[in-house]
């Protein structure tokens, strides 16, 4: 099978880029993609919240009022979990573990499913080469518009390009990634994906 290929001048090439059907021609598995995306986001999450237990809140052990005779409900101390300002029965802690386990084969299958759906929706294109001469954001914006793209673009390259990285760093809707660091969340989040021919080959090697 082939995917759309753009030459370095921004024009569609005469022939598309031949790709592996095993990587870019899979059926879309929505349940698996959901599992992969949720697991990736959960594994990137860090526990930053902390709440106080009954022992940790500021309190006194003095009984608020007598056990009997007042007509009010009995109360022991101000740190009770049902009191305003009291401790939490099951507090969140900074060492909370949010990680989700997902098998490597399932993860790769999920990424292949996403890539295949991007091809079907005509959201994934290949380009012969993608680079800028100097680290200038304006130059990159002009290059992206010259290729027919607007905001919301994920660029996959086969090797790190410092000029390209620095040029895209200040663009909130453009992300440049090396193919080896591609993740399911970025693939799903961006409306359009542009990959160099070298990046496509690297994806095929990684996901084979």
Curated annotation (Swiss-Prot):
Pfam families: Ribosomal_L4
Gene Ontology biological process terms in this record: translation
Region (Disordered) location: 54-78
Domain of life of the native organism: Bacteria
Keywords (A to Z) from UniProt: Ribonucleoprotein, Ribosomal protein, RNA-binding, rRNA-binding
GO molecular function ontology, one term from the record: structural constituent of ribosome
Gene Ontology cellular component terms for the protein in this record: ribonucleoprotein complex; ribosome
Leader sequence segment: none
Known role: One of the primary rRNA binding proteins, this protein initially binds near the 5'-end of the 23S rRNA. It is important during the early stages of 50S assembly. It makes multiple contacts with different domains of the 23S rRNA in the assembled 50S subunit and ribosome. Forms part of the polypeptide exit tunnel.
Family: Belongs to the universal ribosomal protein uL4 family.
Subunit: Part of the 50S ribosomal subunit.
Entry protein name: Large ribosomal subunit protein uL4
Organism listed in the record: Methylobacillus flagellatus (strain ATCC 51484 / DSM 6875 / VKM B-1610 / KT)
Gene this protein is translated from: rplD
């Amino acid at each position: 099978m082939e995917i759309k290929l753009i030459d370095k001048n921004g024009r569609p090439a005469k022939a598309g880029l031949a790709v592996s059907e095993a990587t870019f021609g899979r059926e879309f598995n929505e349940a698996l993609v959901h599992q992969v995306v949720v697991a990736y986001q959960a594994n990137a999450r860090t526990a930053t919240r902390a709440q106080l237990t009954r022992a940790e809140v500021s309190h006194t052990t003095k009984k608020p009022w007598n056990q009997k005779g007042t007509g009010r409900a009995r109360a022991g101390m101000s740190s009770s979990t049902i009191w305003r300002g009291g401790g939490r029965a099951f507090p969140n802690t900074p060492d909370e573990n949010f990680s989700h386990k997902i098998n490597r084969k399932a993860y790769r299958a999920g990424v292949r499913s996403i890539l295949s759906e991007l091809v079907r929706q005509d959201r994934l294109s290949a380009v012969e080469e993608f680079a800028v001469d100097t680290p200038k954001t304006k130059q990159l914006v002009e290059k992206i518009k010259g290729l027919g793209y607007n905001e919301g673009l994920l660029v996959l390259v086969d090797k790190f390009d410092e000029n390209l990285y620095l040029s895209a760093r200040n663009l909130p809707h453009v992300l440049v990634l090396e193919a080896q660091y591609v993740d399911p969340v970025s693939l799903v989040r961006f409306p359009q994906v542009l990959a160099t021919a070298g990046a496509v080959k690297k994806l095929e090697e990684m996901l084979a």
